[in-house]
Curated annotation (Swiss-Prot):
Its EC number is 2.7.11.1. It catalyses: L-seryl-[protein] + ATP = O-phospho-L-seryl-[protein] + ADP + H(+); L-threonyl-[protein] + ATP = O-phospho-L-threonyl-[protein] + ADP + H(+). This is Calcium-dependent protein kinase 26. It is an enzyme of class 2 (transferase). One of its GO terms (molecular function) is calcium ion binding. The lineage of its organism: Eukaryota, Viridiplantae, Streptophyta, Embryophyta, Tracheophyta. Ca(2+) 4 binds at residues 444, 446, 448, 450, 455. The gene is CPK26. Residues 325-360, 361-396, 397-432, 436-466 form the EF-hand domain. Ca(2+) 3 binds at residues 410, 412, 414, 416, 421. It comes from Arabidopsis thaliana.
Length: 484
């Protein structure tokens, strides 16, 4: 997207739309994401309530960001009508925002519902995964790969009806043709399929991700776990599934058989979504037992869910605090590397520029970096590609941003985050139902009942759960260039 006069002037949607304020009145904030905010809104003509996702155009830096938003809207329209996919009502644009109006899901997140209910069994997990894999099958049958399935992306329309579960976020979804191979690394670390990390994948990756969700639903923890993001990736590529630790000795063989079929490392041998739905463990009146699972499963599920929520809040704080000045700093860096002022960085310019910033990367690593950043495969990196490749990675873990996020929670400046301060932050972020004791318990390594800065940083670096890992697998640009 051209930056003439700022991208606010361009039509992201390709045409002028009616003003959203003529049709809807915007209400209170429901949530915050990397690119914008979701509000409650009311249709003026009918009084019906909807959710409105307002995307900040200022943050759509590259052409790819704009295409992602357009594609998300197209895919939501394309999938409209499937009962477990959120219904889009319309999309609108003004000089500052793109607004997507959709069905309101006020019943809360999937994990929260499981935890609140208390009684939980394999049968209940089977009912839930049947809905999730049903969404995958619907997407695949219509030529859509989701690419970012995770529990947070499933909400209940009504908190008393588990069958009202809806998939809500299609921001990373793409259209695919049979046999088409994808290379960009996207998704969330705990859920990513091995072939995605190897940059050679298709729709089978969605079934792997659903298999990870099923493992968590039954045991309370993810199957591939480590202290760092790289450690998680290594575990995913190794593919060893733990069926020995508690609660697995008490879990049915049929459940384990299904998980093995979904978490098969070879995509060609993995179950399809259709095969999963026909598995005896999942079928109606199937073999999934209805006896209560060990209470420790719910307890672990609470801790895993709670830690992710704290991390998401911290990432929002960081994303919102990125200033025009910081983007300007990256602009200067781009200019310094673009020595011939052509508006694009060649391989040689990138290599020379990284050397100036103290990098010791090998040529092959610089080539990988170049490929990851070169979105349009032109052989060079233009300004938009450079900003997109660097802003989403380096900003999240830079020391000053982690410190400012920590200070956001540490309201009294004591050097510790307490349960009261977390409560205050949750209220500010509209996340009042988070299980705060479990957040503290999970993150607090020295068991003093509060979170210090070291514990906070360790949590943030344990598998970032942001909206996308796009390009973050090429960690070296952050370590060698931008942290200077």
């Amino acid at each position: 997207m051209k930056h003439s006069g700022g991208n606010q002037a361009c039509y992201v949607l390709g045409q002028k739309t009616p003003s959203i304020r003529d049709l809807y009145s915007l209400g209170h904030k429901l949530g915050q994401g990397q690119f914008g905010t979701t509000y409650m809104c009311k249709e003026i003509s009918t009084g019906r309530e909807y959710a409105c996702k307002s995307i900040t155009k200022r943050k759509l830096i590259s052409k790819e960001d704009v295409e992602d938003v357009r594609r998300e809207i197209q895919i939501m329209h394309h999938l409209a009508g499937y009962k477990n996919i959120v219904t889009i009502k319309g999309a609108y644009e003004d000089p500052l925002y793109v607004h997507i109006v959709m069905e309101l899901c006020s019943g809360g997140e999937l994990f929260d519902r499981i935890i609140q209910r208390g009684h939980y069994s394999e049968r209940k997990a089977a009912e839930l995964i049947k809905i999730i894999v049903g969404v995958v099958e619907a997407c695949h049958s219509l030529g859509v790969m989701h690419r970012d399935l995770k529990p947070e992306n499933f909400l209940l329309v009504n908190k008393d009806d588990d069958f009202s579960l809806k998939a809500i976020d299609f921001g990373l979804s793409v259209f695919f043709k049979p046999g088409q191979i994808f290379e960009d690394v996207v998704g969330s670390p705990y859920y990513v399929a091995p072939e995605v990390l190897l940059k050679h994948y298709g729709p089978e990756a969605d079934v792997w991700t659903a298999g990870v969700i099923l493992y968590i639903l039954v045991s309370g923890v993810p199957p591939f776990w480590a202290e760092t993001q790289q450690g998680i990736f290594d575990a995913v590529l190794k593919g060893h599934i733990d069926f020995d630790s508690d609660p697995w000795p008490l879990i049915s063989d049929s459940a384990k058989n299904l998980i093995r079929g979904m978490l098969c490392s070879r995509p060609s041998e993995r179950l399809t979504a259709h095969q999963v739905l026909r598995h005896p463990w999942i079928c109606e009146n199937g073999v999934a037992p209805d006896r209560a699972l060990d209470p420790a499963v719910l307890s672990r599920l609470k801790q895993f869910s709670a830690m992710n929520k704290l991390k998401q809040m911290a990432l929002r704080v960081i994303a919102e605090s990125l200033s025009e000045e910081e983007i300007a700093g990256l602009k200067e860096m781009f200019k310094a590397m673009d020595t011939d002022n052509s508006g694009a960085i060649t391989f040689d310019e990138l290599k020379a520029g990284l050397r100036r910033y103290g990098s010791t990367l090998k040529d092959t690593e610089i080539r990988d970096l170049m490929e990851a950043a070169d979105i349009d495969k032109s052989g060079t990196i233009d300004y938009g590609e450079f900003i997109a490749a660097t802003i989403h990675l380096n900003k999240l873990e830079r020391e000053e941003h982690l410190l400012s996020a920590f200070r956001y929670f540490d309201k009294d400046g004591s050097g510790y985050i307490t349960i009261d301060e977390l409560q205050h932050a949750c209220a500010e972020q509209g996340m009042s139902d988070v299980f705060l004791e479990d957040v503290i318990k999970e993150v607090d390594q020295d068991n003093d009942g509060r979170i210090d800065y070291g514990e906070f940083v360790a949590m943030m670096q344990k598998g970032i759960v942001g909206r996308t890992m796009r390009k973050s697998i090429n960690m070296s640009i952050r370590n060698n260039a931008v942290s200077q």
